């Protein structure tokens, strides 16, 4: 794996974790149960703008 590929992979991983944490927190604060908040976290990851991440 090249340095560029590794850097991109780390960037995507960080963005996924950040999106999931924010999605879970927002859902929990809105009163969703653990399961609902987890689903919201996964949806937040699915909605990431991957093109923007790749462009930098």
Where are these regions (language model features)?
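N-terminal acidic leader/helix
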Residues: 1-26
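Short, charge-rich amphipathic interface segments used for partner binding and complex assembly
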Residues: 29-56
């Amino acid at each position: 794996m090249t340095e560029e590929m590794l850097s991109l992979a780390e960037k995507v991983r960080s963005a996924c974790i950040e999106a999931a944490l924010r999605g879970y927190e927002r859902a929990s604060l809105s009163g969703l149960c653990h399961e609902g908040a987890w689903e919201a976290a996964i949806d937040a990851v699915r909605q990431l703008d991957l093109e923007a991440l790749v462009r930098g």
